[in-house]
Swiss-Prot record:
Protein name: Methylenetetrahydrofolate--tRNA-(uracil-5-)-methyltransferase TrmFO
NCBIfam families with a match to the protein in the record: gid_trmFO (TIGR00137), PRK05335.1 (NF003739)
Organism lineage: Bacteria, Bacillati, Bacillota, Bacilli, Lactobacillales
Cofactors named for this entry: FAD
Organism: Streptococcus pyogenes serotype M2 (strain MGAS10270)
Residue stretches spanning the membrane: none
Amino acid sequence: MSQSTATYINVIGAGLAGSEAAYQIAKRGIPVKLYEMRGVKATPQHKTTNFAELVCSNSFRGDSLTNAVGLLKEEMRRLDSIIMRNGEANRVPAGGAMAVDREGYAESVTAELENHPLIEVIRDEITEIPDDAITVIATGPLTSDALAEKIHALNGGDGFYFYDAAAPIIDKSTIDMSKVYLKSRYDKGEAAYLNCPMTKEEFMAFHEALTTAEEAPLNSFEKEKYFEGCMPIEVMAKRGIKTMLYGPMKPVGLEYPDDYTGPRDGEFKTPYAVVQLRQDNTAGSLYNIVGFQTHLKWGEQKRVFQMIPGLENAEFVRYGVMHRNSYMDSPNLLTETFQSRRNPNLFFAGQMTGVEGYVESAASGLVAGINAARLFKREEALIFPQTTAIGSLPHYVTHADSKHFQPMNVNFGIIKELEGLRIRDKKERYEAIASRALADLDTCLASL
């Protein structure tokens, strides 16, 4: 397919990702047609017609460079992010986090984009993928059915799908490896899972805690997606004392290794129950809890799941969530610039690409917007270093295992490890990673 000869770029959706993409394109001197259906057609979760509206929390999370999202925000500031700039201008006290006056912030983003001389705001619902120009689609996790159908067809009918559950992901370095063992069920293939065995007593206590834990409330627009095919672990537990033993905690084929010295029920060779952890990234620094999609409150997840042997001190880089969410099979469909592999004139941004969170969504819009502009100018694509947060996030979502791909927040586990350095102190290690990231980003920008 040849490159479009249009004199403008389309951006569909004016959430965090679309707003950022539109600004980055216009900043580079290219006219933008920014489409937003709110004002013509409402959504269940938005309360206003403002751009970049925050529909849940007003927090952009931690602001320290020893926090991965704090590093990402600093990188975005250096890239002149409209979301970060207006967030700073509307900041409210929140301790070590960055929180904003949600209305003032959204109003200021809206005003800046509406008053930009190169941005034409069009309040209308888009139901077809435009073929008149380079286009960035940033329509969010609740993309309208009509447009979702078109994206589904574009991707061959199998690359755009609904998924409403995600299991917690933990930092491997915080797992007590003395209490777990590496094994695949029935020893099929390579030993690929970390197994957390439970005695009957441990399982009964865990079951009791799980069935009495407090769940997060569902929004009205989410209830329809609470279905049998993706049952939360706490719902499964409430169906019977042994239901989980025939599901994600099934011990069959996961016998203790000969050198196992932890607690066990008598001389049994197989644990009473097993929780499996599966590697979640290519670096092997992140593991998810297999089959543990959940809608428990985050504090309850930490309390209950830290009862699992080996996870007593586990750090969660992402808690489990249960919500309606549409996102793409990005590892098969997108490049690291969020460009479609099947239609090079098309970019995607925001949660539909598999990034999770306000800041991450805006960051994906920044990357997509810059690269849409570079494509328009027939310049080489800009891929940020994997040593940076803004480089590692698109790398993760476009190189993850497609079969088990789930949305991801930015975290230090997906950023390239330090080379030639082994820093035991976590704070010092994160500081070193952040220092390297900012230096590498500055070098990258200086070379442009």
